[in-house]
């Protein structure tokens, strides 16, 4: 996963993958089929790991909304610290989603799952009075997903960390009761 994440699909050679995995060419083909299939599996692993992080935060936090806010702020912090890699899914979107139907389908499905999870968190937060009653949870969930993606792209483009934190804080405050 890390080789694709750091270099992208096109810039990663089969030899790069073999060296990173410490296996022979035939073993890779036997296990994964081809480079493309391995890339799709790496994307799936990334989604599983990042989804587990958010789920863990939600289950440990005093409220799901607090966890979501912390997650958005941590994206701003983490994005500013890891400029070279960015977000694997954002990278896949910008590199391949337009030309690769498999990647496009994975990115869309992952985004839909993320929006659904955010929407449920926002519904619960609204019920608890943590989110403004006028907020449309579906629109806000999409807004947060796009804010997170934008933070990651902006960090990769060199936007200063304080600006990233400010963007994340503004996104969160726009949802709170007025």
Where are these regions (language model features)?
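Helix-turn-helix
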Residues: 3-37, 41
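Hydrophobic alpha-helical connector segments
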Residues: 41, 54-85, 137-144
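Amphipathic C-terminal alpha-helical segment
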Residues: 78-79, 124, 144-161, 174-178
């Amino acid at each position: 996963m890390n080789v694709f994440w750091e270099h992208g699909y096109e810039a990663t050679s089969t030899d790069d993958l073999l060296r990173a995995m410490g296996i022979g060419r035939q073993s890779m083909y036997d296990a994964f089929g081809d480079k493309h299939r391995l890339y799709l599996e790496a994307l799936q692993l990334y989604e599983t790991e990042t989804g587990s992080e958010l789920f863990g935060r939600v289950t440990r936090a005093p409220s799901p909304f607090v966890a979501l806010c912390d997650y958005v702020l941590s994206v701003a912090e983490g994005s500013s610290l890891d400029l070279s890699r960015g977000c694997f899914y954002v990278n896949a979107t910008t590199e391949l989603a337009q030309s690769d139907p498999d990647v496009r389908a994975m990115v869309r499905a992952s985004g839909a799952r993320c929006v659904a999870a955010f929407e449920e968190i926002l519904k619960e937060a609204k019920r608890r009075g943590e989110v403004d009653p006028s907020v449309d949870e579906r629109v806000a969930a999409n807004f947060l997903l796009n804010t997170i993606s934008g933070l990651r792209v902006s960090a990769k483009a060199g936007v200063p960390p304080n600006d990233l934190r400010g963007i994340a804080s503004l996104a969160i405050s726009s949802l709170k009761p007025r």
